[in-house]
Amino acid sequence: MKIIAKIPAWMLLCLFILSPTTETIYTSGLPSLTKYFGIDGGITQTTSTLYFLGFALGILTLGRLSDIYGRRPIALLGLFIYVISSIISIFAVNIEMLMIARFVQAFGVSVGSVIGQAMARDSYQGSELSYVYASLSPWLLFIPSLGSSIGGYIIEYSSWHYVFVFFSLTGTILLALYYKVLPETNSYIDFSQSSKYFEVLQVIIKDKILWLYAFIIGAFNGIYYGFFIEAPFIFIDKMKVSSSFYGKLAFLLSFAAIFGGFLGGYLIKKRHVHDKKVMGLGFIFSLCGCILFAVNAFILEVVSASHSLAIAMIFVPMMIHMVGHNLLIPMTLRYALVDYAKVTGTAGSIFGAIYYVVIAAVTYLVSKIHSETISNFALLCFVLSISSAISFYCIWVLYKKKHKL
């Protein structure tokens, strides 16, 4: 297969980090948005739910369009949509207008994930692809975590409007840069692949294992993003910490995530621990973190604690969970599509859309149970972690049955 041009790793990185960094920057301003529009915090949080639904729709459709029309034009189209919707968000006069703009923004920015992954697969194969992903992995964990700090400083020294000014400027710079230098990597643009797409869709609909993997990935990412949409109300609104200080606190989670990523690599490459055992260890870390989080949350409801102690009682369990998150999720993504090797692009877009719908559902639940304390969210985290562990056990049972046949 002839490659038209390889995409450099730094271009992939800019695509990959755009969406998660956008969301972590935005969530720092949720309390400010709530006060500005004079609405309940739970309503403000639903803007993130719509964001993930828009993202799911983008993954499902834009990835497919890039197979037909090429990666470069669809990537540029997505960035253009991202910029326009960010500009519209600046002038939102009510929460409904902002919700629509956020949905469209997510639809556009989804090219960072779906087109970025497609371009990576077009440009690199085998061990070279693994090396590119491995070299980018620490940055993919580190840079989005800076988003809370960036958002915190923007909110503290200006207003939520300037969050979208920031998105508009960064999006415009990326669009101009990529218009000049982004290569086309799809060497076999094909206008007649719809039959294959629907064939894969029919198989996926019946694939119980894939649905269970989608639930696990969606649940764990739902916990991650759910924390970022709930925590600002607890720390900024209730504990009265500054927006910038909250951003620094949220940044601590990145170190736990990076540690989990390096621990997984060490166990697999240096200690030759089987991938499935690493996944099991990830569940153990997650369960321990979520159980401790739930216990601490209910203790904080009945016992008065200093701000420093309360912060530690919330962040330490989440850091433990994040270690588990990054032991588990990379392995889950690897195994989920193992039976779809010949149609990874098509299957990946459908699979990604499914688990982003799960993330949207989790963030919607977070908005519905929003309260003045963290206990409701902590209980949800515990339930999701237990449910994911049960799903993993069901996958193991289904694999055993499959191999017996």
From Swiss-Prot:
One of its GO terms (molecular function) is xenobiotic transmembrane transporter activity. Keywords: Cell inner membrane, Cell membrane, Membrane, Transmembrane, Transmembrane helix, Transport. The keyword Cell membrane applies. It is found in: Cell inner membrane. GO terms for biological process: xenobiotic detoxification by transmembrane export across the plasma membrane. It is a multi-pass membrane protein. Gene3D superfamilies: Multidrug resistance protein D. This is Uncharacterized transporter RF_0358. It comes from Rickettsia felis (strain ATCC VR-1525 / URRWXCal2) (Rickettsia azadi). The lineage of its organism: Bacteria, Pseudomonadati, Pseudomonadota, Alphaproteobacteria, Rickettsiales.
